[in-house]
Amino acid sequence: IKKEIEIGNSFLINLTAKTRINSNYTIGEIFNGANAKYTCYLKDEFVCFSPETFVKIKDGKIYSYPMKGTINASIPDAKNILLQNQKEISEHATMVDLIRNDLSRVSKNVKVTKYRYYEEIVTQEGNLGQVSSEIMGELAVNYNENIGDTLFDLLPAGSISGAPKQKTVNIIAAAENEDRGYYTGIAGYYDGKNLDSTVLIRYLQNDGYYRSGGGITCNSDALNEYQEMIDKVYVPLF
């Protein structure tokens, strides 16, 4: 991964891995008890409790909320540490630029309406601090006639792939050496006018493997990246 970055084939690579966990609950029971922004369950396959929006469509506008930057919120001054970390600043800027370009393919007058705002996610192990941005574009009047094309044109989500997207996807496939399946795909609800969708992260498979990951850049430290991946392994049952 670092070699591909060093020779300029990618600026940001979202690398993921599996962690074996033990639970007294089935994934269906976890779904019924999970407390998360988005929950998704596919029988005999997976349960997902994602904090990340993929895109929203409302009143003819499309919004994306790339999430890049994670920290254990119990660390003293965690918010400022995360917001001032140069690696995280660079990673987030790369992702915002990628998503802005993605939205420009399906909408007009694209702009960043919120940049690097901090939120906390509650887990049994303690809170996680995460940083997101909001990007907005204006859709064509007849956008609902091509909603499928719009979504597929934005896939895969930038936050779980990297930049440049297609080359980075190829690097990820070679490094992970395993199909992600449903993991890091999207799910959502569309009523014919408005859409709300999520990226399938914070993901537990029926075989007991939990999948998590993070963004790798030229400034990444292996131990810090490993710790971030472990911090993201949690089941939000309270």
Located regions from the model:
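Extended alpha-helical targeting/anchoring segments
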Residues: 1-238
